[in-house]
From Swiss-Prot:
<dbReference type="Pfam" id="PF03684">
    <property type="entry name" value="UPF0179"/>
</dbReference>
<protein>
    <recommendedName>
        <fullName>UPF0179 protein Mevan_0979</fullName>
    </recommendedName>
</protein>
<comment type="similarity">
    <text>Belongs to the UPF0179 family.</text>
</comment>
<dbReference type="InterPro" id="IPR005369">
    <property type="entry name" value="UPF0179"/>
</dbReference>
Amino acid sequence: MKKITLIGSELAKTGNEFIYLGHLNECESCRFKRICHNNLDVGARYKIVSVRSANHPCTVHENGVKVVEVAPAEFTILIESKKALEGVTLTHANVLCDKVCCKNYLSCHPEGISGKYKVSSIFSEKIDCQKGHSLKKVSIISLDESNK
């Protein structure tokens, strides 16, 4: 589902992705606070799908902000093979692993998943896990509150 929000003008480019981290103290008295923050879920990853041309003043972003339309971003992660079913909705849980130097660690512990997600496709490549876990690479879309 697409949502309207504001983002720094320098960052407002179609195709850019971001993880929403919440509002700052500087946002409390801003007249745009509602549109900036009320449509987004903290910790969720979004992709900018369109940018409007008007620029608005902002105390956080030096060059102001633009109105953008965003949608949950699709990205790849690693999950347990037994859970890797196309179309299934899962509640995210990181793969149990403490091997922070492993090349797969960030895919097993991804940022930008807020709760539930839907598996949109499964890759066939073999994943070598240092801990011996049976893993699959999948493409997912985070489900925000309005999609649940």
